[in-house]
């Protein structure tokens, strides 16, 4: 972290940026990516991309709002325990030299939204439920004895800018952890969707 808190990866006509989460969150990272792409298009092709819709002006001084630590500004005095039950952890076979595989799935957005609507959940909740179902099925294969299984959880980031009037580009996200306990029995996909949806509604306010 002290050497470099983020890095830009380029491969053919694709690039990605990896951030240490203390630096920023998904919102700040997306703004950086848009601004970086705008600058690339400017230098490579001479295109002028206006500094709007999440694109910052490279030569402009950052505002105090962009640099603000919104956690310090909006944090209250209420303290809550962060202790949770232990979740089941995925395991795999490490690749040689720390190599990591990237699996990409492309889904038409209209179809994804329509599917989420059928289950009465948001797209985020639908994808979370799908991951939880896959993890539960994998755990059932690896841990045949139900009583030895552990809760299935997915950590979902929540953009706190939707709850507080903040324009910070620093990390301003919280997390919600929907879960199902396979020791209580098998869950249908509808039941998992409902569990995720109600957990999100309970905590995301």
What does each of the following model-derived ranges do?
Residues 36-47, 131-142, 200, 204:
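A generic secondary-structure signal for well-formed alpha-helical elements
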Residues 1-6, 104, 113, 137-205:
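Acyl-thioester-dependent acyl-group transfer interface
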Residues 11, 23, 27-31, 35-114:
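Non-catalytic, low-complexity flexible loops and terminal extensions
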Residues 11, 20, 157-159:
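Structured loops at beta-to-helix junctions and adjacent beta-edge loops in soluble globular domains
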Residues 1-16, 30:
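Well-ordered mid-protein domain cores that form the structural environment of catalytic cofactors
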Residues 13-15, 99-101, 174-176:
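Short amphipathic alpha-helical segments
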Residues 17-34, 102-147:
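Acyl activation and transfer enzymes in specialized metabolism, enriched
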Residues 29-30, 37-38, 43-45, 52, ...:
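Alpha-helix boundary/interfacial micro-motifs
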């Amino acid at each position: 972290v002290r050497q470099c808190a983020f890095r830009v990866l380029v491969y053919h006509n694709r690039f990605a940026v990896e951030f240490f989460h203390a630096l920023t969150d998904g919102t700040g990272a997306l703004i950086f990516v848009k601004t970086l792409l705008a600058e690339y298009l400017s230098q490579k092709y001479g295109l002028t991309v206006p500094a709007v819709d999440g694109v910052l002006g490279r030569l402009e001084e950052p505002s105090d709002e962009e640099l603000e630590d919104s956690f310090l500004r909006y944090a209250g005095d209420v303290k809550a325990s962060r202790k949770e039950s232990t979740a089941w952890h995925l395991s795999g076979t490490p690749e040689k030299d720390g190599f990591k595989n990237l699996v990409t799935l492309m889904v038409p957005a209209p179809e994804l939204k329509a599917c989420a609507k059928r289950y009465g959940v948001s797209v985020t909740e639908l994808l979370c439920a799908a991951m939880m179902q896959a993890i539960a099925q994998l755990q059932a294969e690896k841990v045949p004895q139900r009583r030895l299984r552990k809760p299935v959880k997915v950590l979902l980031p929540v953009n706190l800018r939707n709850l507080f009037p903040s324009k910070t580009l620093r990390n301003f996200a919280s997390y919600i952890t929907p879960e199902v306990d396979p020791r209580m029995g098998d869950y249908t996909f509808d039941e998992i969707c409902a569990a995720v949806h109600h957990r999100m509604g309970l905590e995301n306010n």
